[in-house]
Amino acid sequence: SPSSIIPKFATEQAACFDLTACFEIGDKIKCIAQSQNETLRRATDRGIAIHPNERFLIPTGLILDIPQGYCVEVYIRSGISYKLGLTLNNCVGIIDSDYTEQLYISVANNSGTAQYIQKGERIAQAKLVKLVETVLEETLERPGLKTDRVSGFGSTGKN
């Protein structure tokens, strides 16, 4: 999109590049409203209004050309999550190398009030990740103990 913002790293040592919201006033943005029905909502001069418990696909205006053997991982920016209560619907977005459509950020409002995303606002961050070729094999035997772990959730570090 001509109005999209090229992703960039915010600092010299930033692990991820920032992704911004790309829309114009009047654009229709896809959302799942409180009624749980998919609908379109228009962006206004205040931005995109995301009410509590609503989910939106925020456009970035970007189409990524991801090399084969890589993926892009997408995370919500910590300030957006902490200050606004917005999260990614799937916690971490995974963009495969064969996806060649516009990138959208799937955002949910977990706060108790409406939140607004502004045009050009940095809402997510992403990184290019090299994939490790993995072969999955079925086995009928449980793996042997590798450490002194004896249980699951919250069990390590206890005597």
Which sequence ranges carry the predicted segments?
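DUTPase catalytic domain/fold
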Residues: 1-159
